[in-house]
Curated annotation (Swiss-Prot):
Organism: Macaca fascicularis
Positions of region (CM1 motif): 51-94
Protein's recorded name: CDK5 regulatory subunit-associated protein 2
Modified residues (Phosphoserine): S547, S862
Location of the protein in the cell: Cytoplasm, Cytoskeleton, Microtubule organizing center, Centrosome; Golgi apparatus; Cytoplasm; Cytoplasm, Cytoskeleton
Function per UniProt: Potential regulator of CDK5 activity via its interaction with CDK5R1. Negative regulator of centriole disengagement (licensing) which maintains centriole engagement and cohesion. Involved in regulation of mitotic spindle orientation. Plays a role in the spindle checkpoint activation by acting as a transcriptional regulator of both BUBR1 and MAD2 promoter. Together with EB1/MAPRE1, may promote microtubule polymerization, bundle formation, growth and dynamics at the plus ends. Regulates centrosomal maturation by recruitment of the gamma-tubulin ring complex (gTuRC) onto centrosomes.
Pfam families, per the entry: CC_CDK5RAP2, Cnn_1N
GO cellular component: centrosome; cytoplasm; Golgi apparatus; microtubule; microtubule plus-end; mitotic spindle pole; pericentriolar material; perinuclear region of cytoplasm
Length: 862
């Protein structure tokens, strides 16, 4: 059964996917069967893909390999079917009608699939052939046209070379014949010379009759030979003339035919090329037609030159004909001369007879003999003259022949030059075609690149604009939110300032003279550092960060708005890509400059902050040291000077107390004046700048805690401390430089710094100038609207910062100089404090001895 299946179905291809119920019972380890044989329809899927895409470039080898693989798989499937049938027969001994039906159906499916496969293979073969024919058609046609043109050009070149060789051979043969003719003429000259010599000898030998007879016989023989040679030369001349006439006529015909062929061949080739170019390249038609017209004009000019050369050749032929006519006339003359020679020969015969008669009649008459000799001499002279004329004519003929040969060589050279010009024109045409194709390809590539770049640039700008619009929208929302918050905080600050002013006015009315003493005591003994709590510091730092971030966001927004407005304007104006690139380069350069300026500004700010922090640290250390020293000195004075004060009299004590009261009043007035000025400056510098609600609440709580602790016995100082704190901790959210500058001036707003400033009005002026200059700088920074203006103001700001640094250094020097004065003031205050205490003790011991300058102790409620 297996043999029958193999013989019937050689290229069977089938799938058993339809009868999946039979597959699980099949063993995988059968003999002679590949376990990797697939029962799915993977092969058919590959075939279907190939039928779907018939234009795929595939060779016949690929198809043959695929067919062999299909045959192998078909064979494996047949074996598997055979073993399946045997296994089914072994397992099922009962009725097998269902199995037979399935087998028949499978065979039917296999045959149908086989037919489909054959049809698809045919389609694939046809498609591959069609693709190959289409791919090779264009190249084959171009190659065929090129080969035809090359063959025609080679044929024309071969014909021209053959004709040229034939002409050269003919010219060489004619030259050889002419040389032979010239050699014959030379021999004739030699013979004539020999005849003349012989005639001269005959004159000498007229003594002997026998010798004369022999000489006459020889002369007759020579004359006959000369006649024969003349006849042969005349025959040669006629043959040469006939050959020349024959050569001239076919040469003219050949040259005209060749020229016509040469003219017709390139015209036909050009017509074919123009037709092909019209079909393939319609746009190139104008350029090719212009070039063809130029070539046709060149060909016409060359045809005109050839026509002129033909006319010249005709003229030359006419000249040759004229020369032939002259030769004929000369031949006639030669015939006449021959007739004369015959007459002379007859005369010679008569002379012989006369000589014979003279021999017989030797002695009859010498006079007749001499007359005969004179007649012969006359004949010889005539023959000599005729020979000379013939030799001159021969020279003229040679010269004319040389001229004709030169003209023929010139014509051949001109013909070669024209052929070379034609070849060069063909080469230039081919080169021009190649260059035009290359240029077109380059132009197409450039257009594609330009279009791609334009698309990329448009997409990029669109993306940038969309992103920028989104960013602007988000940032505008943030700005609105922040402005609302700042307005709310400004309102709260204004309320807080109004409350502070009311409290200050109330405290002014509650002050009494008792508070003066307690205030002086508080100034000397107590240390009121007016330090802020860590919570307030953190809140201030957060607010500073928020304000700095807010300002940076505003600056970035302004920069981006300027950049994007400029970009939108440039895009709306629809300038060229070069302008856009130049603007982008300028923007990048400005950004780099801004980044450099920002870095330099940050470095300067860091250096200033470091210097300011060092100065603050030193000042705080110095103030703390001075306070410790004053407290220590006060203790020492209390212990050591107790006995010295007891020795004072009542009048001295009264004077010292009155002086101290006046000094304290002056200090108090100066202190109030200084605090008012500082408060005014703080209000001027920080008016309109909001604080957060948390900061206000924390400040209020801290102030209440300080009041509850009772750090200072002076009520005025209790109410003024929040203002000092306010002036210390107030930072404008406009810029970070103001915060740094106010942190630098914070130590000056402490109580100990106020005492120093009271004693030094020049320091007050310097502080005022610094504050006013810093405020002007802040206003100038805020007033900058666009990026270009800020870039121009950066060097000015650097200069102003440098000037402020110098001023700060000067103030630090002044502060260092004022340390000594502080020591003196503190010593004086300690001394006055001790004196006041002793005086108070002495007065209290006396009954009813109250001094008018003294006051009752302070109330706890104040």
């Amino acid at each position: 059964m297996m043999d029958s299946v193999l013989e019937e179905d050689v290229t069977l291809l089938g799938t058993l996917s339809g009868c999946s119920g039979l597959v699980p019972n099949v063993p995988d380890d059968l003999d002679g069967i590949n376990p990797d044989a697939r029962l799915g329809n993977g092969v058919l899927s590959n075939v279907s893909e190939e039928t779907v895409s018939p234009t795929r470039a595939r060779n016949m080898k690929d198809f043959e390999n695929q067919i062999t693989e299909l045959k192998k798989e078909n064979f494996n499937l047949k074996l598997r079917i055979y073993f399946l049938e045997e296994r089914m027969q072994q397992e099922f001994h009962g009725p097998a009608e269902h199995i037979y039906k399935t087998n028949i159906e499978l065979k039917v499916e296999v045959e149908s699939l086989k037919r489909e496969l054959q049809e698809r293979e045919r389609l694939l073969i046809r498609a591959s052939k069609a693709v190959e024919s289409l791919a090779e058609a264009g190249g084959s046609e171009i190659q065929r046209v090129k080969e035809d043109a090359r063959k025609k050009v080679q044929q024309v070149e071969d014909l021209l070379t053959k004709r040229i060789l034939l002409l050269e051979k003919d010219v060489k043969a004619a030259q050889a014949e002419l040389e032979k003719a010239f050699a014959g003429t030379e021999t004739e000259k030699a013979l004539r010379l020999s005849l003349e010599s012989k005639l001269s000898e005959m004159k000498k030998m007229h003594k002997g009759d026998l010798a004369m007879a022999l000489v006459l016989d020889e002369k007759d023989r020579l004359i006959e030979e000369l006649k024969l040679s003349l006849k042969s030369k005349e025959a040669l001349i006629q043959c040469l003339k006939e050959e020349k006439s024959q050569m001239a006529s076919p040469d003219e015909n050949v040259s005209s035919g060749e020229l016509r062929g040469l003219c017709a061949a390139p015209r036909e080739e050009k017509e074919r090329e123009t037709e092909a170019a019209q079909m393939e390249h319609q746009k190139e038609r104008n350029s090719f037609e212009e070039r063809i017209q130029a070539l046709e004009e060149d060909l016409r000019e060359k045809e005109r030159e050839i026509a002129t050369e033909k006319k010249n050749s005709l003229k030359r032929d006419k000249a040759i004909q004229g020369l032939t006519m002259a030769l004929k006339s000369k031949e006639k003359k030669v015939e006449e001369l021959n007739s004369e020679i015959e007459k002379l020969s007859a005369a010679f015969a008569k002379a012989r007879e006369a000589l014979q008669k003279a021999q017989t009649q030797e002695f009859q008459g010498s006079e007749n003999y001499e007359a005969a000799l004179s007649g012969k001499e006359a004949l010889l002279t005539e023959l000599r003259s005729q020979n000379l004329t013939k030799s001159a004519e021969n020279h003229r003929l040679r010269r004319s022949i040389k001229k004709i040969t030169q003209e023929l060589s010139d014509l051949q050279q001109e013909r070669e030059r024209l052929e070379k010009d034609l070849e060069e024109a063909h080469r230039e045409k081919s080169r021009g075609d190649c260059t035009i194709r290359d240029l077109r390809n380059e132009v197409e590539k450039l257009r594609n690149e330009v279009n791609e770049r334009k698309k990329a640039m448009e997409n990029r700008y669109k993306n940038l604009l969309s992103e920028s619009s989104k960013k602007l929208h988000n940032q505008e929302q943030v700005i609105k939110h922040l402005t609302e918050r700042t307005n709310h905080k400004d309102m709260l600050l204004q309320k807080f300032n109004e409350k502070d002013l009311e409290v200050i006015q109330q405290n002014h009315y509650l002050m009494t003279a008792e508070d003066l003493e307690l205030r002086s005591e508080g100034l000397i003994t107590e240390k009121c550092p007016s330090q802020q709590s860590p919570g307030s510091k953190t809140i201030f730092s957060k607010e500073e960060k928020q304000s700095s971030d807010y300002q940076e966001l505003i600056q970035v927004l302004k920069k981006e708005q300027d950049i994007y407005t400029h970009l939108v304007k440039s895009l709306q104006e629809s300038d060229s890509i070069n302008n856009l690139q130049a603007e982008l380069n300028n923007i990048f350069a400005l950004r780099k400059q801004l980044e450099r300026d920002v870095l330099s500004y940050q470095n300067l700010r860091r250096t200033l902050e470091e210097q300011i922090s060092e100065i603050r640290r030193r000042e705080e250390e110095s103030f703390s040291f001075y306070s410790d020293q004053t407290s220590y000195l006060s203790i020492c004075l209390e212990e050591n000077n107790r006995f010295q004060v007891e020795h004072f009299s009542q009048e001295e004590l009264k004077k010292k107390v009155s002086d101290l009261i006046q000094l304290v009043k002056e200090l108090y007035t100066d202190d109030q004046h200084l605090k008012k000025t500082i408060f005014d400056l703080s209000c001027m510098g920080f008016q309109g700048n909001g604080f957060p609600d948390r900061l206000v609440s924390t400040e209020q709580t801290e102030i209440m805690k300080d009041l509850s602790k009772g750090g200072c016995k002076n009520g005025y100082l209790r109410h003024t401390e929040p203002k000092i704190l306010e002036s210390d901790g107030a930072h404008t959210p406009g810029c970070l430089e103001e915060g740094v500058f106010i942190n630098l001036l914070a130590p000056l707003f402490n109580e100990k710094a106020t005492l120093l400033l009271e004693s030094r009005p020049d320091l007050l002026k310097v502080v005022r100038e610094l504050l006013l200059g810093h405020l002007c700088l802040a206003e100038q920074d805020v007033s900058g609207e666009h990026l270009g203006g800020k870039t121009e103001k950066t060097p000015k700001l650097h200069k102003k910062l440098f000037e402020q640094e110098k001023k700060l250094q000067n103030t630090m020097k002044l502060l260092q100089l004022s340390k000594r004065q502080e020591k003196v003031i503190f010593d004086q205050l300690v001394v006055t404090h001790k004196i006041l205490r002793k005086a108070r003790g002495n007065l209290e011991l006396r009954p009813g001895g109250a001094h008018p300058g003294t006051c009752s102790p302070s109330r706890p409620g104040s």
